[in-house]
Amino acid sequence: MTVLVTGANGFVGGAVVACLARDSTTRVRAAVRRSSVTAAMTGDVVPVDELDMNTDWRQAVQGCHTVVHAAARVHMMQDGGRDSLTLYRAVNVGGTLALARQAAAAGARRFVFLSSIKVNGESTSARRPFRADDAPAPVDPYGVSKAEAEDGLRTLGLLLGLEVVIIRPVLVYGPGVKANFDAMLRWVQRGVPLPFALVRNCRSLVALDNLVDLVRCVITHPAAQGQTFLVSDGDDVSTAELLRRCARAMDTKARLLPVPLALLRTGARLLGRGAAAQRLLGDLQVDISPTRERLGWTPVVTMPDALRQTAMALRARRRP
């Protein structure tokens, strides 16, 4: 069975390629942007141009049974406004649907789409976690574009006989993670005092290994067809507890200061960082019980173990 993985040189896509390559019954084809191709890349690597509605995927999808679509215009904190939504739609909607059409035309049977929990919204309340069957409530351009891509894929699936499977991950962390999570780890490692001792929120995260294992599962699982799955570690934590766990993973102690939440929110608002504060102070939980029950799937790594692996990778990157 040949599986095409897009975004194969990215954080998630690269891990999916590595996982599937360990299965002797699966031939992995890695699609990467033409500008990212290097001489060090080996195996079945297919270069593609910029992702949009005009991308030519014919070489990449030829002979593929399944497509795992991990390539996307990713969420950036500073993105916003109408022009931003246009850019997100071009890649995440137009590019995704063009790939699905060409894959179906080439005879692909299944299309696994890496979406985002942002389709559900930005936060939960009253300890009521998001569910896959909740009405979509995206807030930012990235979430809107992912929701529209999901709708388009469901329609194409019905029209073209393509088995569409959608996965909505929460924040993904693991060895090689970048951006805010990487910055947080470095703050903890350096002993930077952080004002989150009083934060008692509840947030779901997913280790890279757990997300990748779910992708592996839905590629062939008969009960995955036409379904949407939420995924997390099944171990929700507060920001304060997450920082403590990160510190333990790095054999240090988190320096947390007891700053009142109202003061944190006010300060963030005055600095124009309200959205960032919500991610640190607010709740975002997901219910993965339907994922577990329908697929017989369970997370393969615990959060403490995944954080230790992430910390080890961070230390390895810092060595000369």
Regions found by a protein language model. Name each.
Residues V3-D23:
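N-terminal Rossmann NAD(P)H-binding glycine-rich loop of SDR-like oxidoreductase domains
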Residues S36, V48-G94, A98, Q102, ...:
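NAD(P)H-binding glycine-rich loop region in Rossmannoid oxidoreductase-like domains
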Residues R82-A90, T124-V172, P193-L194:
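Catalytic helix-loop patch of NAD(P)-dependent Rossmann-fold dehydrogenases
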Residues L97-P141:
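Conserved Rossmann-fold NAD(P)-dependent oxidoreductase catalytic core, especially the SDR/UDP-sugar
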Residues G174, F196-C202, F229-D236, R245-D251, ...:
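Glycine-rich Rossmann NAD(P)(H)-binding loop
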Residues V177-A183, A197-T220, G226-L230:
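Substrate-positioning beta->alpha
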Residues L208, E241, G267-T298, Q309:
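Conserved C-terminal active-site "lid" loop/helix of NAD(P)H-dependent oxidoreductases
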Residues C217-A275, P304, R308-A311, R317-P320:
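Mid/C-terminal beta-alpha module of Rossmann-like enzyme folds, strongest
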